[in-house]
Amino acid sequence: MQAMQIRQLFPRLYSNKQPALANGIIETTLQPSFGNTKSITMETKPLPYLGEEDSGRTYYLIIAKDMSADKWLEQQSTVKKALNIGICDNEYIVRKFHQNYSPLSNVDHSPLHQSIFDFLDPNEHEMIKTQLSTASTESNSCDIVVRTISFEDISGLEMRATICPIFDGFGAIQEYAFSVWDLKEANDSGQPGMKLKIWMAKRDISTSQLSLSTGISIQTISKLRNGKITKPQRLTAELIASELRVEITDIWPEVGRR
């Protein structure tokens, strides 16, 4: 692609003082034939001299990346900090995933590079696909509640999320961006350690932070999280529940009963 063609496609990249396209990676916008203006990153590399017939002309190799999904996630973060964020492609393979809290398990259950449906309750797959199809048809984000499968060390979770379909320049689904805002056990497992982990995740507080604010040792909190201690002393339960802004019975029903 010649510099003149690039100037016509991306007029914002140029000024009277800078007639040549800069090398490297830059952020700009692109107006596709379908939909709204897209935010992109564009890497430009000048190509070697090709011959006498191209004398005086500069050609570039351009690698452009659509940043629409990332920008949507950034915008969502200004409203509220999500528990999880991610991007999956049009085949539902997760290409980006980030968890904003301490892991609920010592085992890695990240869905990265796997189908998102491998982690969701099979009984809800068709319902979820229908909701995604409706959101895509209407070109709108949608709120959705999904349930995950259970693992040996983690009970199934119920998650409330917002999903946004992202289109390519021709109007086809390119990917989906998602933010998870809330989670809880899909069914009561009766495991206080799991309840504690979930409430700590929802309150965005780590083991070390909870230890510092309550005066309870990190070792004790870790044992409570891992289920090695299932019934703490009442004062310990009160301090933790107060810091997490929940009732004692939300985590330890037996301790909460007088």
Task: Label each region the model flagged.
Residues 1, 100-112, 246:
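PAS/PAS-like sensory domain cap-loop motif
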Residues 181-205:
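A short, Lys/Arg-rich alpha-helix, primarily the initiator
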Residues 65-72, 182-186:
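PAS-associated C-terminal cap
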Residues 216-231:
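Recognition helix of helix-turn-helix/homeodomain-like DNA-binding domains
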Residues 42-60, 161-176:
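Short loop/turn elements at sensory-signaling interfaces that couple input to output
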Residues 68-104:
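Sensory modules in modular signal-transduction proteins
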Residues 235-250:
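DNA major-groove recognition helix of helix-turn-helix/homeodomain DNA-binding modules
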Residues 2-36, 120-150:
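Terminal output helix/cap of sensory domains in signal transduction proteins
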